[in-house]
Regions:
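Long, low-complexity serine/threonine/glycine- and acidic-rich segments characteristic of extracellular
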Residues: 1-52, 154, 158-161, 165-168, ...
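Proteolytic processing hotspots in large secreted/extracellular or virion-associated proteins
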Residues: 56-58, 64-73, 99-144, 192
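Predominantly extracellular/luminal regions of secreted and cell-surface proteins
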Residues: 72-99
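Primarily secretory-pathway and cell-envelope proteins
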Residues: 87, 196-198, 202, 210, ...
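Short edge beta-strand/loop segments characteristic of extracellular beta-sandwich folds
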Residues: 88, 130-134, 203-211
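Proteolytic-maturation and junctional protease-sensitive modules
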Residues: 119-176, 217-219, 226-227
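Proline-centered linker/hinge motifs at extracellular inter-domain junctions
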Residues: 182-187
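Short, solvent-exposed loop/edge segments of extracellular or virion-exposed proteins
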Residues: 189-195
Length: 273
């Protein structure tokens, strides 16, 4: 079955958008076979039979079970005193009965938690999300809109303040709230420490972590000169491959790490090569 706004090109042989209609009440066998690029195959088999009940083409759910009908091929807007949502046309894959709910704030959040539809409904294009909140001006630079997953983790989505409203763009549904990050990133040396002899090493490694808004940038220097460092996001490891022209003797290593709201940490060490 192909959703109306699904633009993938691998449905070249699709008939009637994948909808199968039976004009009888006989029992039919159905096999669904899926192959990957390496010719691995999975098969699902089942039986199906039509009934005499007419297919309901229109939803008969009462309107109080959802807030607004969103159409996939139109601009969709939803506004309350607390939030504002604006989705470009073709942001969703099919028409949806949009749902919205407010729950009270929990630890580490500023203001309510806003449940925007359902996290299991995919979103194709980024849309604008704006949240109203009364937050002290001195704290605004450290706050941002975050999504909250089922495990209670918060994920950074940024945001810019205009008076008492913060606005950003997101590409998912789910629970959203405002959180603050006032904690500096964490830096730890893996194979470097002050005064270490590294003449037998081929690289310098450190771990960098930020548990809240996430790492935005980093800058490494040796003897005041910028060096190229590779960042392994999954392992949180920064690596500098020592170049052949590094002179023998004592050197100074510096690393600056900044998170997404401007908190920063510095690591300084000397080493002997």
């Amino acid at each position: 079955f192909k959703l109306p706004n699904n633009k993938l090109l691998n449905y070249s042989n699709l008939i009637n958008n994948g909808i199968i209609s039976f004009k009888d009440t006989l029992l039919h066998s159905v096999d669904i076979i899926v192959n990957d690029i390496y010719k691995n195959e999975s098969k699902l088999s089942f039986k199906i039979k039509s009934t005499n009940n007419p297919f309901l083409k229109k939803c008969t759910l009462p309107e109080d079970t959802f807030n607004k009908m969103f159409h996939y091929d139109a601009i969709n807007k939803f506004t309350t005193n607390d939030i504002k949502i604006e989705m470009p046309a073709y942001s969703i894959y099919e028409d949806i009965m949009f749902k919205y709910q407010i729950t009270n704030s929990v630890k580490d959040t500023y203001g309510n938690i806003y449940s925007i539809h359902n996290e299991n409904t995919p979103v194709h294009l980024k849309y604008t999300l704006e949240i109203k909140a009364d937050i002290a001006d001195s704290l605004k630079s450290k706050t941002y809109i975050a999504s909250k997953d089922l495990s209670g983790n918060y994920w950074y989505h940024g945001g810019k303040w205009e008076k008492n409203r913060i606005k950003t763009k997101v590409r998912e549904f789910g629970d959203f709230c405002i959180v603050a990050d006032t904690i500096n990133p964490e830096i730890k040396g893996v194979n470097i420490f002050p005064g270490k002899k590294i003449n037998k090493q081929t690289s310098i490694k450190l771990t960098i972590k930020d548990k809240h808004s996430g790492i935005k940038s980093f800058r490494g220097e040796i003897d005041g000169k910028w060096i190229l460092m590779d960042y392994d996001y999954k392992e949180s490891v920064l690596r500098y491959d020592i170049e052949n022209d590094l002179k023998k003797g004592k050197h100074t290593f510096k690393l600056n790490v900044t998170d997404n709201v401007g908190n920063e940490s510095n690591y300084n060490s000397t080493f002997i090569y």
